[in-house]
Every structure is written in structure tokens, then in C-alpha cells.
A protein has these predicted regions:
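Modules that initiate DNA replication and primer synthesis
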Residues: 1-71, 105-141
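Feature primarily recognizes SF3-like P-loop helicase cores of small DNA viruses
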Residues: 62-107, 134-456
């Protein structure tokens, strides 16, 4: 009664699977059965009930784990001796589909139903351990041999100890370790709020841990979603230049994937304020969700030589990111050309977080800088190699033209799905047409190159 929380149905189900089951359990007695009366009496006499740690869908979760433990035959399986090593292997085997240790991060990654996330502080892993401890008690009750059952109940009781859980969780780290590079490998999978979209094939499938995705977009995929106001907004900020608007749509759609073949960065440049680029960028970042990241301008700024032993968190945070936004760098910022070449050149990057190990990753991110001031460039090869692309925002919205609620409007779920469709359309156009620059983009980029050349 204690371990089942007074749930007579669960008590009956477990008792029938145990070695204590006898035929008299089903004997009719006093208008009921011997078993039902026994359970009722046990619940009535119970002074307290066990309160499981995992309350959500507890019965289903316990039943699923109980069945897994039975299939693994954990009490008699030589893989799981009744010690720290065996307990570590059991934890790793029980949760290998949803919990894996990442040595570079010195953390477990846990699947939350939509994506794999780092278990900061080990809290989610500890909850899994508590749930497994609860299931082991129920498993012990299914053992038919009385002596064996008693011994295994004593062993499973150890799992309720925090110190013991910490020990076997630590032992489990080495069983199925996974490298950072094994996550987010499919650069065309876009993990949406309601499933995963393959941007190459158009196929849409439910979330699954087997995809090994650590990011999720901020929008649900609805192929029928439309937002005429956003379409009109794009035309407005591009001053009615359809070719420039089409190119901008392709540049933003490019950010949906992890494909970096074009090896360039985009400057959304407007010398005047109130030109719409901030609203456009924030709306896109909202749709991108985890795939988008706001990056400090200092990340691309020239600076004194840094100690290679120092953490490179600005770069480490870009692992798995596809849309990196740098907003409004200061006037007079000097671009770190070597850093830009590294970040846009498809080379493997190495980075580390504070107090963690370093790791390598292939960049999937594209750089988008929205600014009123273009940074100083001294290395003209950034232009000759096509790494710098300027998309001009020439429109200035007067006060009477401004819509104060536009950002809120575009962040609504229905609008976010429509903007996602617009981005997908942009990526489709990019595949079909390539990145040929319209006159406005060519002229703006050439002007920037000319001004930079004079400064050299």
C-alpha cells in the first residue's frame, strides 16, 4: 500500500505478477473477493503513502519502465551486478534513448520531448534516477523467489539515497558517451514546434530523439499559414524594390538551414533610423527560436591578441546555431578580418565554455549584421572573395507611419508560422535561382568597398 500510494488497482496488478499470488486471491467472499478485501484493509491500515518524484503520467511511466526492467531481467543479468558499476550500466541502459553524457560539456544531455538539452546542474538526470529507483521497487515485487525478492528489495532501497544516486550516475557517464559533433548533423532538418521539417524534401515527421537535434524553432509548421501584413511590410522596408525584396527573402531563408556554402555575411544597412530592419530582424529571430542567436558586436571586432587558453564562449554558443544576428555595432568598429574569414569559411571551429573542455564543430551559422554604421575593413579580400554583402534599407518611416504594435503582431503564433513559410519560400527560391545580386545590392556593396579602399 505504501509503495503504490494506496492505488488498489496497481497493488492488485503487481501482486498478481509476484510470487505471492495464490488461487484464493480470486475467491468470492462477503460480496467481494478475498484479494479486494485484503487490499482495502491494507490501505485502511496504512499510516502513510509513498509520494513518487515524477508525478506527471506517473502510472504510465512506471508501467513502461517496469516492463523494460522485466525485459532486461535486471535482477539476474550479469551485466547488472548489484554494485555501483552495475547500477551505472542499468541507469545508462534504461535511459540511453533520452539521456547521454557529453564529455566536452561535462554534462548530461536529456531529451525533453522535442530536442536534446544540456542538463544544467544535473537536475533532470537526478529526476530520471529517482523515477528509476521507484520502478526498481515495483520490479522487485515481481520476483517470484521469496529470498531473491527480499534481497533485491534491499538492493533497490539503496537507490533512494541521494549519495548512491550520485555515484551510479557518475559511473553511467562512460557507458554511452556522445560527442557534441553527433548532434545537429542533418543541416536540412528544421525542428519546429509541432514536428521536424526536412527542408530538402519537404517531408514533415514527429519529434524523435533519434534525430539528435538540440535546437527548436519558435514557430509551428503550417504550410497554409499566411500573413498579408508581413508581406506588405517587406515591400515597405524595401521601398517597393521587388528585386531587392526577393534577394533579402533568399538571404533570410538561407538562414533556415545549416548550409554555409556561400561563405558570406550580410549587412542590413540603413544610415537613417526607423527603417524597419530592427522589426524585421526581431521577427526573424523569433521564428528561428533556438536556431537564432544574438551575438555581441565585440565578437567580430578587432582586438589585442587573446590568450588561446581563455574560454571562447562567444564562439562556443554558435554550435548548432544557423542565424547569428549582430545588432547595431558602435560607430568606428574595426572588423576582425581573420575572425570573419574563419567564421564564414566553412572551417572547423574550436571553442569551449568556461570550466568545460574544448570541442570542435562545423559552423552552420550565417552572420546577419543590422546596423546604421558600417564597420571599418582594411582587408580588401573580404570584398573580392564575396564575403561581404550589403542590403540597403533606404526607407525612413515618419512618426505618423510607424505601427507601435507591429513586433507584437508578428510574434503571434499564427504570424510566426506565416513568416516561417515566407522564409521557406526564400530558401526554395535560393535553390532555384542562386544568389545573383540585384543592382541595389551590388551598388551598395561596391560603395562600401570603395569607401573602405580609401581608408586603407
Amino acid at each position: 500500500a505504501f509503495w503504490c500510494g494506496g492505488d488498489t488497482e496497481q497493488m492488485d496488478r503487481l501482486f498478481r505478477k509476484s510470487g505471492l499470488m495464490r488461487s484464493k486471491w480470486n475467491r468470492v467472499q462477503s460480496g467481494s473477493t478475498y484479494g479486494a478485501l485484503t487490499l482495502k484493509k491494507a490501505v485502511a491500515q496504512a499510516m502513510d503513502f509513498y509520494r513518487p518524484y515524477a508525478r506527471t503520467s506517473a502510472e504510465s511511466d512506471f508501467d513502461d519502465m517496469l516492463q523494460k526492467l522485466i525485459e532486461l531481467n535486471v535482477s539476474d543479468n550479469s551485466r547488472y551486478p548489484w554494485n555501483d558499476n552495475g547500477s551505472g550500466r542499468l541507469f545508462a541502459d534504461a535511459y540511453k534513448d533520452i539521456a547521454r553524457y557529453v564529455p566536452e560539456r561535462k554534462k548530461w544531455y536529456v531529451y525533453d520531448g522535442t530536442r536534446w538539452i544540456p542538463d544544467i546542474g544535473g537536475l533532470k538526470t537526478m529526476e530520471l534516477a529517482k523515477s528509476l529507483a521507484d520502478s526498481l521497487v515495483r520490479y522487485a515485487l515481481t520476483i517470484t523467489d521469496e529470498r531473491r525478492r527480499k534481497d533485491y528489495l534491499e538492493y533497490s532501497a539503496k537507490w533512494q539515497s541521494r549519495n548512491y544516486r550520485n555515484t551510479y550516475i557518475s559511473d553511467a557517464q562512460s557507458v554511452y558517451p556522445i560527442a557534441m559533433s553527433e548532434f545537429d548533423c542533418n543541416i536540412y532538418y528544421l525542428n519546429c514546434q509541432n514536428g521536424t521539417l526536412d527542408l530538402q524534401t519537404g517531408e514533415f515527421h514527429p519529434h524523435t530523439p533519434q534525430d539528435k537535434l538540440t535546437k527548436i524553432a519558435g514557430a509551428a509548421y503550417d504550410p497554409n499559414a499566411k500573413n498579408p501584413r508581413f508581406t506588405r511590410f517587406v515591400a515597405e522596408v524595401m521601398s517597393g524594390d521587388a528585386d531587392k525584396a526577393r534577394f533579402m527573402q533568399k538571404s533570410l531563408g538561407y538562414g533556415l538551414t545549416g548550409d554555409t556554402r556561400y561563405e558570406c555575411m550580410f549587412f542590413y544597412y540603413g544610415a537613417t533610423t526607423r527603417n524597419g530592419k530592427g522589426t524585421l530582424m526581431e521577427s526573424t529571430l523569433h521564428v528561428m527560436g533556438d536556431y537564432g542567436l544574438t551575438v555581441r558586436p565585440e565578437t567580430i571586432a578587432a582586438k589585442p591578441s587573446a590568450n588561446s587558453q581563455n574560454p571562447t564562449e562567444d564562439i562556443a554558443r554558435l554550435a548548432g546555431v544557423r542565424f547569428a544576428n549582430i545588432s547595431e555595432p558602435r560607430r568606428g568598429l574595426v572588423l576582425n578580418e581573420a575572425q570573419i574569414k574563419s567564421m564564414t569559411g566553412n572551417d572547423t571551429l574550436n571553442a569551449r565554455f568556461l570550466h568545460e573542455n574544448s570541442f570542435d564543430f562545423k559552423p552552420q551559422f550565417k552572420l546577419y549584421v543590422n546596423t546604421n554604421y558600417l564597420p571599418a575593413i582594411t582587408d580588401m579580400t573580404l570584398f573580392s572573395s564575396g564575403r561581404v554583402v550589403i542590403i540597403p534599407f533606404d526607407r525612413h518611416f515618419e512618426e505618423w507611419e510607424q505601427e507601435q504594435n507591429l513586433k507584437a503582431e508578428f510574434s503571434r503564433p499564427e504570424a510566426a508560422s506565416a513568416i516561417l513559410n515566407w522564409l521557406i519560400e526564400g530558401y526554395t527560391l535560393l535553390q532555384e535561382e542562386g544568389f545573383a545580386q540585384p543592382k541595389a545590392v551590388k551598388d551598395a556593396t561596391m560603395s562600401y568597398q570603395h569607401d573602405s579602399d580609401k581608408m586603407e
